[in-house]
Amino acid sequence: MEKYNYIWEKILKEISKIYSDEVFNETFKNTKKVYKYENEIIFILAENEFIKNKIYKIYLSKINEISKSFFKENLNFKFITKKEIKEEKIDNTNYNIYNYGNLNKKYNFKNFIIGESNKFAFEMSKKISENKEIKINPLYIFGNVGLGKTHLLHSIGNKIIKNNKDKKVLYVKADEFIEDFINQLKEEKIENFKLKYRNIDVLLMDDIQIMSEAKRTQIEFFKLFDYLYLNNKQIVITSDKNTSELKNIMSRLISRFEAGLIIDIKKPDFKHRINILNQKMYEFEIKKIKINKEILELIASCFVNNIREMEGALLRLFNYIQTYSNEIDLNIAKEILKPLLKGKMNNFKNKSYKKEYLEKINIIISSFYNIEINELLGKKKHKKYTLPRHISMYLSKKLYKFSYNEIGKFFKKNHSAISKGCKKIEKNIEQNTEFKKSVDFIIKKIKSKEETEEI
């Protein structure tokens, strides 16, 4: 242990030279203890989950860089919290190298947030992990990046091992599998490769689509797949594509995937995203930090593509709050997240920002038509005022998906009046090329303002 404490102390010393005292004290002050060295991994005790994730996301590459420059060897660092030690009792357990050497214990079924978009994938994954009889084989889960596929893979592995510590579970990313195969091939140790991957009970393969350009590896994986399948070993595969969309993957491999159960994971809906954010706040263990409902709604509304985007936004807020303040409001949150929010604010459904959008749209339109804002919003029936007024209604609907009722409240008009105004503009655009050019120009101005001010 003395050797590894020295290594970590040396790395910390170099980190303190690179970063400010504020950054160092905030992140590394309480990460001075090496917890243990096991399976060629140096375990460092982190203050909490938030600090641990922060180090992984921001500083791990620098830590590895410093390590290589001073010690001339590839050292593996893993950060662990007291909570994880207590829950898993990892200090008293000697797991098979196939298992906890490559499974992430923070992923489990308990902290996987279920919604309509992932419910079936969750249920089938759990069923596989609990059943001794293999009935679903292979299980193929696909969906966009950051929707929880990897979480489910690790959850399956962790649950199987918890139920039966003698089970040999191997989680591997497709790119790691390819690299391993190539290295063993070069060193003429292909039998070692086969022994490693065939001497298992469960194979969890992540991101199979990466194998698309690795023809030789595909052949070897096909042989492995058949060997495991025929010997009644469980196989679970994830991808960002459905089997029908996989390109440059051998047809006989695809047919093997399609012989099992194929499940997709879709994007989570708004309510589901809020639940995920609440879970992330709990995981980060930041008890004194307050993030109100409006701010969570901001994140959930704007970051809709994947969970990692939301987590990144939440981490950014935590960093700011931890450094400067224990509490922030919506306006401050919007400013902190500004670099991440470009082109996304139109998704935000908060009432105050809806008003802000409409106001800024009207500033651009009134300037273009050389009329006053109060005239644009007024009741004058002259075409000079009604045309830009209707354009504002139309663009509020088209660009920002406001409902007729929402637009009506702003203009003090009923649903029918807003609907008629929008339809008039649609008709004019179809019939009048010059008018269409004017509307397109206004849209361009609005989007330009969006990029510079992030309305």
Curated annotation (Swiss-Prot):
Taxonomic superkingdom: Bacteria
Keywords on record: ATP-binding, Cytoplasm, DNA replication, DNA-binding, Lipid-binding, Nucleotide-binding
Region described as Domain III, AAA+ region: spans on this chain: 102-321
Pfam families documented for this protein: Bac_DnaA, Bac_DnaA_C, DnaA_N
Ranges for region Domain IV, binds dsDNA: 322-455
GO annotations of cellular component type: cytoplasm; plasma membrane
One example of a Gene Ontology biological process annotation: DNA replication initiation
InterPro entries registered for this protein in UniProt: AAA+_ATPase, Chromosome_initiator_DnaA, Chromosome_initiator_DnaA-like, Chromosome_initiator_DnaA_CS, DnaA_C, DnaA_dom, DnaA_N_dom, DnaA_N_sf
Subcellular location, record wording: Cytoplasm
Span list, region Domain II: 73-101
Recorded GO MF terms: ATP binding; ATP hydrolysis activity; DNA replication origin binding; lipid binding
Entry binding sites for ATP: 146, 148-150
Stretch list, region Domain I, interacts with DnaA modulators: 1-73
Role noted for this protein: Plays an essential role in the initiation and regulation of chromosomal replication. ATP-DnaA binds to the origin of replication (oriC) to initiate formation of the DNA replication initiation complex once per cell cycle. Binds the DnaA box (a 9 base pair repeat at the origin) and separates the double-stranded (ds)DNA. Forms a right-handed helical filament on oriC DNA; dsDNA binds to the exterior of the filament while single-stranded (ss)DNA is stabiized in the filament's interior.
Subunit structure: Oligomerizes as a right-handed, spiral filament on DNA at oriC.
Domain writeup: Domain I is involved in oligomerization and binding regulators, domain II is flexibile and of varying length in different bacteria, domain III forms the AAA+ region, while domain IV binds dsDNA.
Family: Belongs to the DnaA family.
Protein name: Chromosomal replication initiator protein DnaA
Source organism of the structure: Phytoplasma mali (strain AT)
Gene for this chain: dnaA
